[in-house]
């Protein structure tokens, strides 16, 4: 049987021009750079559009089976200023709880719940530092660990793995997707901060909570994704004859202004999150 999905699409447009004298002098480097500019503008718009959808979906997601405060898909980190093993463990637990059956029981199809984390270079540095920093978040009496209270290092095998693989691309079975756009004050983080609107998040480990900064300059979000399920969809309109996705046309507004040559192009696409249960997050408090 065939099925169809209807979604709203939008056009991403770009236009460039250059002085006709460059073409007359066979300055192909100038002409080539205009094509590069066209591609860069479209890619930049696609990046921001996709990030806005992802961060907005995560910030607004809620599921009744979630163990996070307010049935949200986001938890807070356990230790201020640190992203620890406990936080990764809590993300796995949260993803499992979110993906319960419709009666909040065990689903017929069990998934890992989490396959990737999208994060900043600073969070990756936190992961690497587990090779030489304490990793415990609770004291021997099960209270929140404080400064100088019984610090425990990770297992020897774990620390050795982190030490030998400084440029690690995976950790605890999670693929690490490191982006410079993530992190305090960076554009993906500020998009999330705008969508979150100063929401408060709570740690599953020790029940501490904090309000995410409205500007996204003192806290950051770590995004967890389950890529075993096809829930993040990008649909692109293609030309019926050529199959091309991008349409580039000469700009006729320069027919009178003879000293300019220009062209414009556009791509029509649509993005949708079919099931926001594939998204979880950990808000890291640096305040």
Language model features with spans:
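Assembly/oligomerization interface modules of large self-assembling protein complexes
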Residues: 1-12
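Structural beta-strand/beta-sheet cores of well-ordered domains, especially the beta-sheet scaffolds
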Residues: 14, 110-115, 172, 259-263
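A generic structural motif
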Residues: 16-27
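Short, charged, low-complexity patches
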Residues: 27-35, 39
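Short, glycine/acidic-rich hinge or "gate" loops at secondary-structure transitions
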Residues: 31, 47-66
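Sec-exported extracytoplasmic/periplasmic mature domains
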Residues: 40-47
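Extended, solvent-exposed, turn-rich assembly/linker loops in the middle of proteins
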Residues: 60-167
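Sequence/fold signature of self-assembling virion shell proteins
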Residues: 129-287
């Amino acid at each position: 049987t065939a099925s169809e999905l209807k979604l709203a699409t939008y056009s991403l447009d770009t236009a460039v021009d250059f002085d006709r004298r460059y073409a007359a002098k066979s300055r192909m480097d100038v002409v080539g750079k205009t094509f590069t500019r066209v591609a860069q503008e479209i890619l930049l718009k696609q990046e921001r559009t996709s990030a806005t959808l992802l961060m907005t979906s995560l910030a607004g997601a809620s599921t009744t089976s979630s163990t996070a405060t307010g049935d949200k898909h986001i938890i807070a980190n356990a230790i201020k200023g640190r992203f620890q093993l406990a936080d990764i463990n809590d993300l796995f637990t949260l993803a499992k709880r979110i993906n319960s059956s419709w009666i909040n029981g065990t689903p017929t199809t069990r998934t890992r719940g989490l396959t990737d984390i999208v994060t900043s270079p600073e969070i990756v540095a936190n992961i690497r530092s587990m090779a030489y920093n304490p990793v415990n978040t609770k004291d021997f009496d099960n209270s929140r660990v404080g400064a100088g209270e019984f610090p425990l290092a990770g297992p020897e095998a774990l620390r050795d793995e982190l030490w030998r693989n400084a440029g690690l691309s995976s950790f605890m079975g999670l693929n690490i997707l490191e982006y410079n756009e993530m992190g305090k004050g960076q554009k993906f983080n500020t998009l999330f901060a705008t969508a979150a609107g100063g929401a408060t998040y709570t740690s599953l480990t020790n029940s501490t909570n904090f309000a995410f900064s409205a500007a996204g300059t003192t806290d950051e979000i770590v995004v967890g994704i389950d890529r075993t399920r096809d829930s993040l969809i990008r649909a692109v309109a293609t030309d019926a004859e050529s199959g091309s996705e991008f349409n580039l046309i000469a700009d006729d507004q320069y027919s009178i202004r003879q000293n300019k040559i220009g062209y414009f192009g556009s791509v029509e696409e649509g993005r949708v999150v079919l099931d926001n249960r594939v998204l979880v997050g950990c808000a890291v408090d640096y305040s």
